[in-house]
Design a protein with these regions (language model features):
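Primarily the internal scaffold of c-type cytochrome electron-transfer domains
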Residues: 23-29, 50-89, 117-125, 133-375, ...
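A cross-kingdom marker for long, charged
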Residues: 365-372, 376-440
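Bacterial N-terminal signal peptides
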Residues: 8-18
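Cys/His/Pro-rich metal-binding microdomains
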Residues: 39-47, 103, 128, 170, ...
Length: 440
């Protein structure tokens, strides 16, 4: 099934290495070896072919796909736009194309001493930004007898492992302690950020999941990627909330960690309503708990009791934010410990056809309770629904007519989140209910 909707307009092989990245930053892993530059990968017999090779374990036109279709290739060029320059002026950081806070995510911002002769900053977010410095594996990684495991030992980043991939993607698509994307940046005009691992994995892919990929790297499961991504994103939020340096600015917590739409609403609006998952009254700034909320749905087919505990702990965290920093830290650490303990089980779980109905039912139940009161949660629901619908079709659970109907309902759901400024809770809930009714 083609992965559709708004965002197209815009597996676990070894738990050990992926989980270890929680302590050893993904950024450190990427920057631990010299970066030789995109040009070192673009030879026509390597990754620079104009067309995909038929009888190859990889497509070999990865460079061409990246250069022509992938926004990562134009990330550095974006810094020369009038909008980027305006943001930089407001922040007082000078030329955005030279400012570290911008280069961290709009380029491969490896230190000067770790750059090879063919490295160019203007290449944007290139191969080694995600696959890691290639100094120790470039020459050997395609040799006969060299395995993917060998490449990982030599410094290649394990992007095939969903936990590791999520930790890396989040460094720029949401921000982490070592690449903090702050509310000041947003206030200066930077677009709001959101992320969902499975959806973003399939935006302009330069790879395909086939027999060769599966043989080398293991079975792929999109719903599991979605599930893992929600857990890792939730962990990241809670780590930042309890980070005295990255998560706080003076007497204030870092506001980028909070729900944008809890404050950014029309002054004439009267849209507040209660949420069981927070227990907060009107006029209270709320943490952006969209990923935590989604992780409860992840658990629906895995451990319902754990999902219930997570609801209680999430509510306790929201309540703690109205009391003190100490209470907030304690509640956040407790919730983080729960998610951290559940993540390996989620990553190892086989999200087969029988689990999809449980996930959709859990999502729909929260809609009926009024949990999706703001755009951020609705956006995550739409991306979750896409992962589940794709899985329905890939698993052969629906026939062609049912697949067409589901795609139509999914497109209608995405249409309701196309514009966050005019988002309608009622239209969103109606579209979600229609999608749920059409599901097997």
């Amino acid at each position: 099934m083609k992965r559709g909707g708004l965002l197209l307009i815009v597996i676990l092989l070894a738990l050990g290495p992926a989980i270890a990245l929680a302590a050893n930053s993904a950024v450190n892993a990427i920057e631990s070896h010299k970066h030789l530059g995109v040009a070192s990968c673009s030879n026509s017999v390597c990754h620079g072919a104009s067309q995909a090779f038929r009888d190859s374990s990889i497509q070999q036109n990865e460079f061409a796909i990246w250069q022509e279709f992938d926004p990562h290739a134009k990330a550095w060029q974006t810094l020369g736009s009038d909008a980027s320059k305006a943001i930089a002026r407001k922040l007082g950081i000078g030329d955005p194309a030279a400012a570290k806070v911008c280069l961290d995510c709009h380029a491969d911002s490896i230190a000067d001493g770790m750059r090879g002769e063919r490295f160019q900053l203007s290449d944007g977010v290139g191969c080694e930004s995600c696959h890691g410095g290639s100094e120790s594996w470039l020459n050997a990684h395609a040799d006969k007898g060299v395995t993917h495991k060998d490449n990982l030992k030599n410094g290649m980043y394990p992007t095939d492992q969903p936990i590791a991939r999520a930790r890396l993607c989040l460094t720029c698509h949401m921000g982490t302690a070592d690449r903090m994307i702050t509310h000041r940046i947003m206030g200066a005009g930077h677009p709001r950020l959101s992320f969902e691992l499975d959806t973003f994995t399939w935006l302009h892919p330069h790879y395909k999941i086939d027999e060769s990929w599966t043989r080398r790297k293991g079975e792929w499961n999109g719903v599991r990627d979605w599930a893992v991504g929600q857990g890792v994103a939730a962990e990241n939020l809670l780590e930042l909330v309890t980070d005295e340096k990255a998560g706080w600015q003076g007497i204030f917590p870092e506001l980028v960690l909070f729900d944008c739409h809890a404050c950014h609403q029309l002054m004439s609006g009267r849209t507040w309503g209660p949420r069981q998952g927070t227990g907060l009254g009107p006029g209270v700034v709320r943490l952006n708990d969209a990923n935590i909320l989604m992780f409860r749905h992840v658990l629906a087919p895995v451990d319902k009791a754990a999902a219930s505990r997570l609801l209680e702990q999430t509510r306790a965290l929201h309540q703690a934010t109205t009391k003190s920093r100490e209470a907030t830290f304690a509640a956040a650490r407790k919730l983080h410990a729960s998610i951290e303990g559940l993540l390996p089980m989620v990553a190892a779980f086989n999200y087969g056809p029988e689990s999809l109905d449980a996930i959709l039912s859990s999502i729909e139940a929260d809609a009926a309770r009024g949990e999706y009161r703001d755009y951020a949660a609705a956006e995550q629901v739409a991306m979750a629904a896409q992962s589940v619908v794709v899985a329905f079709e890939n698993d052969g659970k629906v026939d062609a007519d049912k697949a067409t109907l589901l795609r139509s309902r999914l497109d209608a759901l995405y249409a309701t989140i196309k514009n966050e400024d005019s988002w309608s809770r009622e239209k969103f809930r109606s579209a979600l209910a229609a999608l749920r009714a059409a599901a097997p």
